Structures are given as structure tokens and as C-alpha cells.
């Protein structure tokens, strides 16, 4: 229930941000701006707690946001952040930014592929993953979100939406173990 209510609050703000971006030809700029915000929030649990705390004065939140984003985000995007503070929705900032990016990808026929690898991928490997995902999905382009997990031992796991393609050594060993455990 909580997730549904949260989603119902996030979607209209993300759509409004996308509409603003499109009307002023700022979709790419807002994508960068939302990425910056997501990076700031991911790097600081204190910032997340500060913004989410309803007891903190809204003006203090605005000042912190201005200081963190001065000359880094477009003025319209900063105004949007101030609006979220005024409407007491700043606690939804990360979700709104993520949803904005998802809406923009959908609009541009770009899919997000979450790639987990045992080691850092080379440029050639990244290109191969992008081409494989394009073939699988029919998307115009692919955005990669890469994470490193040494426990995979080797290979990659690619997640696109609800589809998972497990080409990891750990996955192969698990499948082999399951097949060997079955009676003949």
C-alpha cells in the first residue's frame, strides 16, 4: 500500500519535470541534473535524512540544495527542487529523479540494462553487451548501469526490466549443481 501511494505521488512530479524539460528543450540537461542529484543522495545518507526530516525548516533545505547545486543544475531544475521543498515532497526526490530518467528512456526507446560483472568491463565488452541487449529488446539504444561483484567468479548477469540473462560462472555452476542433483 505504501509503495502504491508513493508511486502515485512520484509519477505526476516526474511527468511534470519531463513536460517542463521538453517544452524548453532541456531533456538532456535535466537528465544530467537528475543524475547529479542521484549521485549526491547516494553519496550522503546524511543529506537524505536531512531532506526527509519534516522537522527541519524548509528554508534550511532550500539553502542546502542551492549550495550543493549552484552552477551545476539548470535554473528551472533548481526551481523544481524548491517546489518539492515547498510542497513537502522533497523526500521523494530520488524516486522522482529515477522516474524522470525512466520516462525519458521510454520516450526515446532506450532500455536500462543493469549489468553485474566479476571485473570491470572493457569498452569492447560494454559494446558487446549493448549490442546484445539491443538485439534482445529491439531498443534504439541501451543505457548501462554496471556493478562489480567478485562473487560471480566470471562472466556477467544482465537484467533488463524483468528479464535476467545469467552468463556468470556462478550461475553456470549453480545450474550444473541442480542438474547433477536430479535423479537420473
From Swiss-Prot:
Sequence intervals crossing the membrane: none
Presence of the UniProt keyword Transport in the record: yes
Location(s) in or outside the cell: Cellular thylakoid membrane
Pfam families tied to this protein: OSCP
Keywords: ATP synthesis, CF(1), Hydrogen ion transport, Ion transport, Membrane, Thylakoid, Transport
Major localisation: membrane
PROSITE patterns attached to this UniProt entry: ATPASE_DELTA
Top-level taxon of origin: Bacteria
Recorded topology in the membrane: Peripheral membrane protein
Cellular component per GO, a single term: plasma membrane-derived thylakoid membrane
GO molecular function: proton-transporting ATP synthase activity, rotational mechanism
Quaternary structure annotation from Swiss-Prot or TrEMBL: F-type ATPases have 2 components, F(1) - the catalytic core - and F(0) - the membrane proton channel. F(1) has five subunits: alpha(3), beta(3), gamma(1), delta(1), epsilon(1). CF(0) has four main subunits: a(1), b(1), b'(1) and c(10-14). The alpha and beta chains form an alternating ring which encloses part of the gamma chain. F(1) is attached to F(0) by a central stalk formed by the gamma and epsilon chains, while a peripheral stalk is formed by the delta, b and b' chains.
Family, as annotated: Belongs to the ATPase delta chain family.
PANTHER family: ATP SYNTHASE DELTA CHAIN
Function summary: F(1)F(0) ATP synthase produces ATP from ADP in the presence of a proton or sodium gradient. F-type ATPases consist of two structural domains, F(1) containing the extramembraneous catalytic core and F(0) containing the membrane proton channel, linked together by a central stalk and a peripheral stalk. During catalysis, ATP synthesis in the catalytic domain of F(1) is coupled via a rotary mechanism of the central stalk subunits to proton translocation. This protein is part of the stalk that links CF(0) to CF(1). It either transmits conformational changes from CF(0) to CF(1) or is implicated in proton conduction.
Name of this protein: ATP synthase subunit delta
Amino acid at each position: 500500500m505504501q509503495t502504491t501511494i508513493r508511486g502515485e505521488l512520484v509519477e505526476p512530479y516526474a511527468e511534470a519535470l519531463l513536460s517542463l524539460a521538453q517544452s524548453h528543450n532541456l531533456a538532456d540537461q535535466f537528465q544530467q541534473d537528475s543524475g547529479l542529484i542521484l549521485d549526491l543522495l547516494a553519496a550522503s545518507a546524511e543529506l537524505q535524512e536531512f531532506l526527509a526530516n519534516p522537522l527541519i525548516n524548509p528554508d534550511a533545505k532550500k539553502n542546502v540544495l542551492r549550495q550543493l547545486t549552484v552552477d551545476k543544475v539548470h535554473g528551472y531544475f533548481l526551481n523544481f527542487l524548491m517546489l518539492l521543498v515547498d510542497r513537502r515532497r522533497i523526500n521523494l526526490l530520488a524516486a522522482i529523479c529515477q522516474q524522470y530518467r525512466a520516462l525519458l528512456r521510454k520516450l526515446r526507446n532506450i532500455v536500462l540494462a543493469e549489468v553485474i560483472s566479476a571485473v570491470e568491463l572493457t569498452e569492447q565488452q560494454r559494446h558487446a553487451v549493448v549490442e546484445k541487449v539491443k538485439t534482445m529488446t529491439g531498443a534504439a539504444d541501451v543505457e548501462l548501469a554496471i556493478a562489480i561483484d567478485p562473487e560471480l567468479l566470471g562472466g556477467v548477469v544482465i537484467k533488463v526490466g524483468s528479464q535476467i540473462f545469467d552468463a556468470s560462472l556462478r550461475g553456470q555452476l549453480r545450474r550444473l549443481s541442480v542438474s547433477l542433483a536430479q535423479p537420473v
